[in-house]
Amino acid sequence: MDAPMEDAPAPVAQVKVIFTTTEPDLELPESKRQLLVPADIRRYGLSRILNSESMLDTGSIPFDFLINGSFLRSSLEDYLTSNGLSLETTLTLQYVRSLIPPVYEASFEHDDWVSAVDVLSATSPAGRWSSAANSSAAVQPGQERVLSASYDGLLRIWNASGSVIATSPSGSHGGHTASIKAAKFLTSDRLASAGMDRTVRVWKYTESDHFTGELKPTLELYGHTGSVDWLDVDGHSKHILTASADGAIGFWSASKASAPEPDASLLPGAHVSKRRKATSSVSTAQRGPLGLWSIHTAPATAAIFDPRDRTVAYSASQDHTVRTLDLTTGQVVSTLTLTHPLLSLSALTRAGTTSPLLAAGTSARHITMVDPRASSATTSVMTLRGHANKVVSLSPSPENEYSLVSGSHDGTCRVWDLRSVRPATKEEGSLGGVSEPVYVIERESWASKGKKKRPVAGDGCKVFSVVWDKLGIFSGGEDKKVQVNRGRNIVTEQK
């Protein structure tokens, strides 16, 4: 009697894919773009195929894959099933370099809410401005610095290990007399801050031994009649932009010699007694703005320099508008009217054009991407959705033109990849594309308390400021901490 035959193994299901990319240096030859792959393959397996010797032979570049504008986050078979497609369907996979997931690194403790944060490194704007002006002023590895501003009215300089190197003096010694709302490095030895005392202040920063430093006020700038809630700087020209609750955009010089005299009626001694004038132990030069333009009908919430043309600025306001401003003439060049109050603004450079793409954070929990060119056919290019409260801070990636991070009152920072976009649904207005976050950064202070669920509105853990540097993502907020998240190895759980 013949032995029973064993069942033959079932054939492995396969799917035909076509690999495409928009990155010329990673393009496959035409003959290698179509391939049959296992239906149960995921992102990691596809990435290994592309890195193999017979394909790109790139070794270890981690890739993500877009199908119809959305990242593949399952097996190809599961994607086909969830979209009602058969295994006979040919899938076009656009491969892109993966973003590195941000991993919690550390927190820097403060006495009060952290309103602003900035980073000084070899690749940060201030670091590049410093090295361009003087090669000996270049920031060396291990000498990076973090700047924080707090509602206690103080600035602090930290090293990368979380030790305070310098603290600004109090109001009676030349510092701010109310909460600070914004602060940035101008260069490696100079910085600017602004706040609820309606002033902009310029500081000289010195270090003697890399362990201790000093912040000395060198200039007080007067002109705004409301809280100064936003600040941007250009270290090359030593110019400062501000946005204020008084609806005005301010344009200032950080150089005492080139700044005009201030309006005497706005100086702190204009309406106080002689006895009170004598309370400050420090005498600091006082100057006015190069330009102060009341161009908004509601509080101005943001003002930024054009990343390529520093004679152009963009401003945002609770009056729903983004305005393009010619800083040489003080004239508004164009006005874009959106549908919600705007609370933050950032610019992403674009290849092939001198005009940036603007990201505007709104009170309606989303981010609107807009083209500021007056000739643009549509105002809104894309909408980034995912936050559950106001979006009050934005920072572009230091390494590419397609990603940014946002900070929100919902208690999170979210990382966005503009290469991933889907059509808007009817409920979303059916206009333009929609992108969703690729990573969500929670406040570690909330998680460390053993809380299983963060309040949807972010009560107790609101984020007020975020900046993205090659060192990592630094954010500050209501939990009285600067939180540091760094990128490490690419996520591998999707193998």
From Swiss-Prot:
GO terms for molecular function: ribonucleoprotein complex binding. One of its GO terms (biological process) is maturation of 5.8S rRNA from tricistronic rRNA transcript (SSU-rRNA, 5.8S rRNA, LSU-rRNA). Residues 15-97 are annotated as: Ubiquitin-like (UBL) domain. Its main location: nucleus. It is found in: Nucleus, Nucleolus; Nucleus, Nucleoplasm. Keywords: Nucleus, Repeat, Ribosome biogenesis, rRNA processing, WD repeat. WD repeats lie at residues 129-168, 175-213, 223-262, 264-295, 296-337, 386-426, 458-495. Gene3D superfamilies: YVTN repeat-like/Quinoprotein amine dehydrogenase (2.130.10.10). GO terms for cellular component: nucleoplasm; PeBoW complex; preribosome, large subunit precursor. The keyword Repeat applies. The keyword rRNA processing applies. Component of the NOP7 complex, which is required for maturation of the 25S and 5.8S ribosomal RNAs and formation of the 60S ribosome. PANTHER family: RIBOSOME BIOGENESIS PROTEIN WDR12, WD40 REPEAT PROTEIN 12, 37. Belongs to the WD repeat WDR12/YTM1 family. Component of the NOP7 complex, composed of ERB1, NOP7 and YTM1. The complex is held together by ERB1, which interacts with NOP7 via its N-terminal domain and with YTM1 via a high-affinity interaction between the seven-bladed beta-propeller domains of the 2 proteins. The NOP7 complex associates with the 66S pre-ribosome. Interacts (via UBL domain) with MDN1 (via VWFA/MIDAS domain). This is Ribosome biogenesis protein YTM1. It comes from Chaetomium thermophilum (strain DSM 1495 / CBS 144.50 / IMI 039719) (Thermochaetoides thermophila). The lineage of its organism: Eukaryota, Fungi, Dikarya, Ascomycota, Pezizomycotina.
